[in-house]
From Swiss-Prot:
Keywords: Cell projection, Cilium biogenesis/degradation, Coiled coil, Cytoplasm, Cytoskeleton. Pfam families: TALPID3 (PF15324). Residues 57-84, 227-247, 312-396, 411-466, 489-523, 639-687, 1079-1178, 1214-1265, 1354-1374, 1500-1554 are annotated as: Disordered. The keyword Coiled coil applies. Its main location: cytoplasm. This is Protein TALPID3. Residues 1240-1265 have a biased composition (Low complexity).
Amino acid sequence: MDSCCVSVNNKTHFNDSTSSSDAADVLIHSTRAGRDEIQDKSQNKVNIYIRRLSDSEHVHSADERRTEIPPVNLPTASDTAGPEEPLAGIKSNQFAGLFGKTSRKEKSKAQSTIMQTEQLKSKGEDVQISTFSADGRGVVSAALRKRSQGAPIRRNVTVQVLDQDRSQTPAGVQPDPAFPLGDPGTSASVAAITAATLAATAPLMKAQSEMEAQISRVSAELKRLQAAEGSVPPGRTARTDSSSAGRAAHLEEQLNILIQQRLQHLETIQCQQIQLQNRLLGSALDVVASRGNSSGVSQTDSLPLQISGNRSIRLSATDNPSAGRPASVSMDVYRERQTGGHKSPLETPAPRKVIPKPTHWTSSTSTNRPPKSSFKNQGNGRLQDQSPNNRRSPERCALQSVGVERFAMATADNSQPEQSRESQMPSKASVTRSAQEDGSSFVNGQNEQERQGEPTNVSSSSTTVQKASEMLQDLGRLKNEMRSLLQTADAFPVPNAKSTQSSRSRHLAPVATAPPPATAPISMPPEPVDVIAVRAAALNRASVLKSIQPPTSMFEDAGLVLRQVRQSKKTLEENLEAILRAKDGEVLHTQLEALSKNRDVREELRIKKTVDAWINTLSKEIQDDLARESSERIVDAAVSRREAGQRTRAEASAAAKKTSVRAQAGNTRAHTRQPAPAVRNKPAVKQEATQPIVLKSQDDEEYLARLYGKAIYDGQRRTLKKSPYLRFNSPTPKSKPQRPKIVETVKGVKMKSSKTQTSQYVGDVSAMQHSVSEPHFIFSPSDPDKQQQQPGSPVRGYLIPMAIPLGKPRVDCQPPVPSRVIITDKPAIVTTSFPPITVVESKPTPAIRKPNAILLEVQSAPKKRTPQLQIQVQPGVNIESALCSSRQASPTPVIPAESILPPPSIHATEDPHAHEDQQENIFPGTNFLAQADISQETNGGLPDSPIEFKGLPSPPADLYHGPVFPPVPTQSTPLTEPILNTIQQRETLENRLVDWVEQQIMARVITGMFPQPAQADPVHQSEPENSVASDIVEAAGGSGLQLFVDTGVPVDSEVIRHYVNEVLTEIIASMLGQREAQGTPATLVQTQDAQKEDTTVPTPAPTPEPSLKDPPSPVRTPDLSEHLSTATSPEKPPQESASPGPDRIPVGTPITTPIPSPTRVATPSPPTPANQSPEPGSLQIHLWEGSELPLEEEEQPELQPAPVVISVPRVDDQEESVIHPSSPVLSKPQSPPAPPLPPVIQKSESSSSSSSSSSESSCSSSVTVTETETAARHISEGELLLNHGQMAAVRVLEQEGVLLPNFMTSLNGSLHGVQDMDYDPPSEGQVIRAPHLPAHHDPVLSLLARMELGPISQSQQPEGWWEEESSGEVSEGQRPVLTAAEEIVLTGHSLMDQQTIRQSRNTQISPHATLTSPGQVIAEHTGAVVEDGGLSVNLRSSDEQKEAMVYQADTVSSPQPESSQMAQTVHRPAPILVRQYEEEPDFPQLRRLSDDAFFGADEKGEDTFLHTGEGGGGGRGSDVRVMSVRLPSVKQDQESVSLSSVEGDTDSSANDVF
């Protein structure tokens, strides 16, 4: 607010801060401008300091309202008179105050003018004069928002004409205490004039500031010119000195003249404005004063009205024509609002007004009692606010103030001139004081104005300011005089003399501090009738004087502050009380609930006793009622009706008793946690019959109303109101109060359970007890079950189910009662009520409870039970027990047994307590619950009683089913869930089946389409796909693609084929799994051609990646070439046949082209020999999952490497060839598995790879597979290879020392998984380069044998391999096609020729080139535990090995290309026997060298049983040490040499398991 600074003095005034701590105060404080800020304001900006005129604070409101326009308004005056300058601000403030409180008419005018002026000023300086009444808090908040946004606040300032005194002060400076402050016309005119004056002065001020700025600029320019002239060269200076000096002098003269003229003009304009203001104020005051004087008493009468109505704003303007001083208008919000506001609330209690005012008038009491009145006023009018009170008071004041104001007028008229003068003199301070007095911080206001005056001192209007300040001081004197007079007048009503002097002293000093007295005159004058009103009038006038009076004693200020504080405190306390009452109600309810839940056992017992007594009394009544009802209706209908009627009677009797009892014991207990039980007992008694229910609802309502003080709701509506019962509320209470009561009970339990649950539950229990004869039984069974559910307690059992279905309970209200009372008559109703309870607690009930009425109707009406007596008896018992059982998930059959009424009735009596205790089982209620349960059991045990009552146990069962009917939906809901689940499962299965069938069909279609492409090339599946695409294009070109062709775009058959191939490939991959779909064609082509062509191709996998898995297995198969056989065993030929495996270049190491040794097929049982070459096929088979064709093709393409697998360059093949002679692999274990595996391709491949560890060894270089009969042994140890179910495969695995557990875990087959479970150290694809990774060589071989796959590097095929035999499982690099050397390394030593392998190994292994097959363990690492495998590798002596079925794992190392720099030593894994060989092998040298090289080259090595041949040809392995190691998954990709083709063959999964 650059242009307009609204500073609100924080000075607390009795009316300002404390009495009205509202948005207005906030606005004032928030908008308050610091004095420093005020001083800093530029003169071109108009600073208006606004004090909120609290509606009740009329005394200080004028001062508060003082809007100071310090620098611009009075620039000259401020300059001339700094101290008086605040007066100028005060004047403006007074002006603002004058037009701040105007009549509505005047307000409209003033608003228009003010708005205009503000708009004018907003262009330059925004002058915002805001007057906020305590009433319009919303407006204040809006204003605050606007101000916070910085937008100028255009607020209409309503000026309260405080007194005629002001109007008289201009002429006679006589403030009429009774002058009609609120004359609408006068106040409006004054406001309009003031607004006009402000609007006129603002431009002048702005012009003055602008002129000053221009002058400063001209002077600065002159100085600059002078400086420039000084800098002129001497010659030119000499020339120009004279001219320039003349020009400068001329300019200076002109400037001086201009400045003087401008200043004179501004001063003239300012003087004119001041005079104008004085005239306006004087005229307004004169009008008011003339009215006040002329009208005399009538004016005094009107004044209180207007004053109070207008909020009694006093304008005290001393118009001294001689002095020409601007009349200082002091706007005072009359204390009238404080006092009047106090009165307004207190006006109702006049004595209070009298009391506080006399105290106020008394110097000692004046400060104190006004606060009391203000407290009472605000307290009573807390909602009313002081301002409305004042407005109210104005009327009374108008009446009362007539006499008071007359009296005050006489005194005021006498003293007004002086007071006005005094007030004028202090008006400088008075304006500040008015704020100070109002804010009870006189010093602060003065300081602010003084500071504000300081900037005005700079202005040239200081003289005017001084004059204005003098006039204000005069006005202040007059105000003081008038205050004293008014105070004396006010004092007269009570203590006139004391009040006069004390009021003078206080009003002189505390006039500001005692706004209540000042306000009282204003607000009181409207009440001339009362002496208090007279006092109020005097006080109001005093407040006017007060506002004028700047010097109020600090004590008076303190008194005002205290009063304000008291008033605000009162208001706050009342508000707090209201809030606390609301909260206390809630707390009370919660406490009552807690008490009901936590009541002591003693209390419960006592309550139960009381309840039992009531039940006994009520039971008789109920029985009578039941008999009556039975006679009226059928036995049940009549009984229910009679119960309703007699229950009403019983309620009358019991109501008196229960009412007294509840009022006494019930209410006390409610506070002591017992009242709820008492209430419950009573309602239980009432609920015994249909009427007991009504009694319960009525009593509960009354009791709750007493306890909670909630009489707001009708008992019925109250309960219904909370819940959906409202529907039934109006009808049920009218037609059948019993039914609504029932509803209330049901919902009351729920709804009240949170608040009044205890009482209601107690009522339910008592009702149960009362209906013990018949209904009790029903309630008792339901109670134990329902105890958990208070609503479901006996009352719940009956009433709740009934209450929940309110609509039907109206019709069926009696049946539930008969169910309680008369078992025979309305079992359906009872059942219905209970089932709802059951439903509520157990399953769908919550919804059912609401419809319970409906259910009740349906069940009661249909009930389908011809024998009503029987039906009611059993259903009632059954229902409650059933409800309990249903809650307990007990079947309905329990109900018939429970149908026995007598024990239930007894228990029912207990049950109410149980229900009371239901909330807390700790209390005897738990015992009652147990008893209730017992009663239910008794009912079950005593089916006779229900039979006796109803005579037919079977009908009760039907009835029970009927009542169950409502719960049936609840059950149906739980049933629906399982049904839905089953349906969903079925649908899911069906969908999966459909998908599977579709996939199978697609697979067949694709296979039919792909067999040719599959044959085309394993690597070049794209070719077969293209052929297929061509076919597709041909087929689709005509029709299938007709749409595309029809588009008019020429169709390219090749493009179509390409897209079709891609789509088919994707579909096939998704359908068959990319592994299978790609594997089959890849395997066919690859197996045939890949051996020759693919040896170099790393992974010519068919488009689907799964083919990658295939090649590793075929690679391993070729890896087992005879070259290895040369090293260790005759099986070398099978290994050589497997050597086509080198075509499995996919093996991580470049595939050496070992001579494929078809002889490897020697042992069909361990398909390894066949597998080694077929392994690619077998891998492909894995892709195709069960097709044996790949196996056949494997045999054919043994020479054909499976290109699909990532193949290392043929260097591997060379390595294989190099390595093959090192260790031939047993052909038998290799060959046998291959044919058997077709059914289980993965397993067979694994078995072949494992069984033909030799085959792997052949692929990896040389693997000696020694077939030993210990295979069975190893199978047991390492788990049998169940892939083919062939002992040969198992033998091969055992011989290989492959750990079957790896296969089991890795293989998809359950058997494989079982076997592998025990030993699963390395992950499938892992290659153990480091010693910690060594894995059993045997597991790899066993995997190969099982899988019937050529040895595949374990690292590459472990995951997919064991899961699916398709080669696709093997990730590229895990199981690339292995060279013979690689396969040997991976496969490990064949059991067949361990010694030979050792020899070859010794010869071939170079310390750096030697690689331990994944199964091998380096001697250095003996005793090392394979981390991946999780198995400890223990190297033991050959003796121990023999003990444990010693298997010599021959490590065959063939020198491999330096690129790989890894001699793959194939260690025949030691027997998979659990035993670990402790002896340290002599092979640490060989195997250590090999392992070092192997591990160094391979990141992961597979631990294997390293058996140094005892008589090893190598010679080094003189000591045969078996190291049982789990093969960690080998990463063949990392190693050029496939570390464990054996493990890989077995299934990379096995390695993964390891």
